[in-house]
Regions:
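OB-fold and OB-like single-stranded nucleic-acid-recognition modules
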Residues: 1-241
Length: 241
């Protein structure tokens, strides 16, 4: 029957789209949250926190901190994540050493301030990373914070550094709440991670897509088309086609 074939096609399109998104890792979810979160001012975020009404919102402001630390290039930083990763066949990169250094910082705009929960900031950080690659045989014991893992010396490894400068502007998505001392803090919540990027949204999406931008576009198209195809199939079935 034509209706059954169309319905099966819709189901198949949805399945393929879902599998393509799964292959892209967490990037697609972070990008979707960043794009879909309603934009609010810092003052509005403070009001949400004061009312005790949890809401996942997107904020923008200038990064501000009373403490900073120097980066390798001398630029003042408020957050740095340094990861060593090993290649696992076609499964991508697996992290075996993860070091983070952060100081308290906040978003500021027009006299308003909202702090960032640095403890919650992880895979939701979207910046242009600094990367260098080599092989496991080049690593020394002081390259990692703990014990150097055992792996074949020819295993590809890479150093990935992501950092946030004290002179940047940033966009962040999360749930505002009242923290210690009555200050407003933006963090994870409602089952969603804290997201922060120092890039404009279009560039952030490109970084999240990485080399899988075409796959993500195809997956999005398939998922958008799936309900349309399914409805057409059900109509055809109802019509006896």
């Amino acid at each position: 029957m034509i209706g059954f074939a169309i319905t099966a096609l819709g189901f198949g399109a949805g399945l393929v789209g879902y599998l393509l998104l799964r292959r892209s890792g967490t990037g697609w979810r972070v990008g979707r949250l960043l794009a879909a979160a309603p934009e609010r001012s810092l003052a509005q975020a403070a009001a949400l926190a004061a009312d005790g009404e949890p809401g996942y919102v997107r904020l923008h402001g200038r990064i501000d901190s009373d403490e900073e630390f120097p980066g390798d290039d001398g630029k003042p930083l408020v957050y740095r994540r340094r990861r060593l990763q090993g290649r696992r066949g076609r499964g991508g990169w697996a992290t075996f050493d993860d070091q983070r250094l952060a100081v308290p910082f906040r978003l500021s705009e027009k006299g308003e301030q909202v702090g960032i929960d640095t403890e919650a900031l992880g895979d939701g950080l979207v910046v242009v990373p600094r990367e260098s690659e080599g092989v496991a045989g080049d690593l020394t014991s002081d390259a990692v914070s703990g014990k150097l893992p055992e792996m074949p010396p020819e295993t590809p490894v890479r150093l990935r550094i992501e950092q946030v400068s004290a002179v940047d502007h940033a966009t962040a998505a999360g749930v505002p709440r009242i923290g210690e001392g009555g200050a407003v803090v933006l963090g994870a919540g409602l089952g969603r991670p804290l997201v922060l990027t120092t890039l404009d949204l279009d560039e952030a999406m490109r970084v999240l897509a990485g080399g899988r931008r075409t796959e993500l576009l195809v997956a999005t198209g398939l998922l958008v088309a799936t309900p349309v195809i399914m409805v057409i199939g059900l109509i055809a079935l109802a019509a006896g086609l």
